[in-house]
Amino acid sequence: MAKIVLTNAYITVGGVDLSDSIASVSLSTTRDAVETTAFGSTAARTRVAGLADNSVTLEFHQDFASGEVEATIYPLIGTSAAVVVKPNGSVTGATNPSYTFNALVTEWTPVNGAVGELATASITWPVDGAITKAVI
């Protein structure tokens, strides 16, 4: 299987392509481990997978221009926004899946940085519902 180096990831938030203003993306999916151990089970605990608890973490390069980062994210605070993440900006396919989901925009840091540094904003938003993976 081929290795991949992320150099051209594609990320949209609320229908706006912000790929050129994002330095890092992490889409994480986990499942609760629900214990099912019953009386008579003496060797070990048993479990089944429960509800998904997914999240997306993005590191933005802040941009206050019209149609860019701040203008896109600020109005979404407190709402559920459509997000699309692909490893590469090219056509969706078996080697470039598209992950589509709604994220609850629970946090935003519009101003962050020190003297002489790039203004950035790192966020982690919970996924609101399921993640859909498309390969065609």
Stretches found by the model and what they are:
Residues 1-136:
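Signature of extracytoplasmic/envelope-associated structural regions
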